Amino acid sequence: MNYNFGGNVFDQEVGVGGEGGGGGEGSGCPWARPCDGCRAAPSVVYCRADAAYLCASCDARVHAANRVASRHERVRVCEACERAPAALACRADAAALCVACDVQVHSANPLPAITIPATSVLAEAVVATATVLGDKDEEVDSWLLLSKDSDNNNNNNNNNDNDNNDNNNSNSSNNGMYFGEVDEYFDLVGYNSYYDNRIENNQDRQYGMHEQQEQQQQQQEMQKEFAEKEGSECVVPSQITMLSEQQHSGYGVVGADQAASMTAGVSAYTDSISNSISFSSMEAGIVPDSTVIDMPNSRILTPAGAINLFSGPSLQMSLHFSSMDREARVLRYREKKKARKFEKTIRYETRKAYAEARPRIKGRFAKRSDVQIEVDQMFSTAALSDGSYGTVPWF
């Protein structure tokens, strides 16, 4: 461990070595606290765990003995009086001071004192050096991207024949270094960003058109499937056709983007309608009278605003189930209910056989001992009943 902290830097402020020091002008602190270990060298650190002032050699010898001793907290000795542990560090003077010396030194100066804990001086120094080196490396790397010193030096070496050539080369090198190179860099950045934006916009448009085409194809396939099922199982009147007609009529009024958003909203809405209808039809004995479409103020929000999809008179009609359809559905439900089979299956045959063989008392299962007790009671009661007639003992 290296504890070379240098000499005292507060001789003039505290009065050491001159007027109030009591020692020579060129000498250090003659009253520095000696090391508690060797009693020969001045102490440089203070160990709080051992409550001892140690020099650099004694500190290395004592605290390097084992791991427990190496974990002891140690602080520097005050650089002004060299007789007390340092409590804080002054950034302006780059020195560690105890409380008394801090008050004595900074009370004479009207400037505000900037102090930090003494234990964090070393950590802050390491962090500061790392950040400074990192900033310098990044700055050097950034300027290396724009450097053309090798090209400029080659031009200057090849064109040193006369003064005119030197002037021309110097002008061209200056232009290339300070103007042409920077302008070229910024122009390229602007052009590249503009070109990249144009390419991204074109790709987004092509991707959007492709998505619109896929959505239209999916919607057409869904319409075909619903049209095929409409004659056999669909109970609600055809809503897909009405919605598609209104979509085609709306395409001529609004733009392509609004039309695409409207088709997406309609497809989502039709999916919800089909789900609600299929769920209601599966319920036993419950036939809904109307669907969500009966609400007159149902709207679909699009980026262009709220568009009323059911403002036309054809869609405002109440979608009630006809009586024939209701009767057919009820009859079909009853037929399915009659066709249900409820068969009793014996899960454990051995248990059934054992239950049939077990003894019972008044219909309930009984243990073997209980049966024997009951039989004994029956015989005892029979004997008592026989004794009521009277028996003559024979000797």
UniProtKB/Swiss-Prot annotation:
One GO MF term: DNA-binding transcription factor activity
Primary location class: nucleus
The record lists Zn(2+) 2 as bound by C78, C81, C101, H106
What does the UniProt PTM comment say about this protein? Phosphorylated by OSK4 in the presence of HDR1.
Low complexity compositional bias: what residue ranges? 152-175
Q: Where are the zinc fingers (B box-type)?
A: 30-72, 73-117
This protein's GO cellular component annotations are: nucleus
Record-level GO BP terms: cell differentiation; flower development; long-day photoperiodism; negative regulation of DNA-templated transcription; negative regulation of long-day photoperiodism, flowering; positive regulation of short-day photoperiodism, flowering; regulation of flower development; regulation of photoperiodism, flowering
Please share what else the UniProt entry notes about this protein.
The GIGANTEA-CONSTANS-FLOWER LOCUS T (GI-CO-FT) pathway to control photoperiodic flowering under LD is conserved between Arabidopsis and rice, but the regulation of the downstream gene by the upstream regulatory gene is reversed in the two species. In Arabidopsis, GI acts as an activator of CO, which in turn activates the floral activator FT under LD conditions. In rice, GI activates HD1/CO in a similar manner to that in Arabidopsis. However, under LD conditions, HD1 suppresses HD3A/FT expression, causing the suppression of flowering.
Name assigned to this protein? Zinc finger protein HD1
Organism from which the protein derives: Oryza sativa subsp. japonica
Gene name of the record: HD1
